[in-house]
């Protein structure tokens, strides 16, 4: 007898950007995926396309490693993701914190291996951050200070430092 293989479904189409309040405010690229974040209706959610595509957000059941990824940053405060910046990890900056989006292991990000960890609780302003070498320069959300976010191997993560030591900008 020949039986149907129902262990994997065909790709299921998904479009989270269809209507008022659903358009992303931050877009970037990371590990061959286009990343969207910061909608009005889902301010702490991120969507990553299928590997190697610009807008394909389809997924299968059970999930495959190249499927689209959708998740929400669970934080103590609800803040819209303002900026996405690709470094060694994907950095998501909100008005109250800086988040590191990475894999739970050292492999690529997949639907089953995505992890989000806070790096600091300073927050970024509306001005577009600048990547210089392997650091991010950004305006703080409060106080008018310019800050640097860079990896520190002793801390095992990204730390932020104030570059406006003498006067705010």
Question: What does each of the following model-derived ranges do?
Answer:
Residues 1-23:
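Small/polar beta-strand repeat architecture
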Residues 2-5, 32, 39:
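Generic structural motif
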Residues 2-9, 60-70:
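Acidic/polar, low-complexity linker and loop regions
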Residues 12-13, 68-71, 115:
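Short, flexible loop segments at the rims of nucleotide/cofactor-binding pockets, characterized by
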Residues 25-27, 33, 41, 72-169:
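Beta-sheet-dominated scaffold domains
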């Amino acid at each position: 007898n020949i039986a149907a293989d129902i262990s994997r479904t065909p790709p299921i189409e998904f479009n989270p950007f269809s209507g008022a309040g659903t358009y992303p405010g931050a877009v970037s690229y990371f590990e061959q995926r286009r990343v969207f974040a910061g909608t009005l209706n889902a301010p702490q959610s991120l969507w990553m396309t299928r590997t190697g595509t610009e807008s394909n957000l389809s997924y299968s059941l059970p999930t495959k490693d190249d499927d689209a990824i959708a998740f929400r940053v669970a934080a103590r405060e609800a803040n819209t993701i303002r900026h996405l910046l690709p470094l060694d990890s994907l950095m998501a900056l909100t008005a109250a914190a800086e988040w590191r989006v990475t894999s739970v292991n050292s492999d690529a990000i997949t639907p089953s291996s995505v992890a989000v960890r806070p790096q600091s609780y300073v927050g970024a302003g509306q001005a577009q951050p600048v990547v210089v070498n392997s650091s991010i320069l950004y305006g703080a959300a409060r106080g008018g200070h310019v800050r640097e976010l860079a990896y520190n191997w002793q801390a095992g993560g990204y730390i932020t430092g104030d570059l406006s030591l003498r006067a705010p900008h």
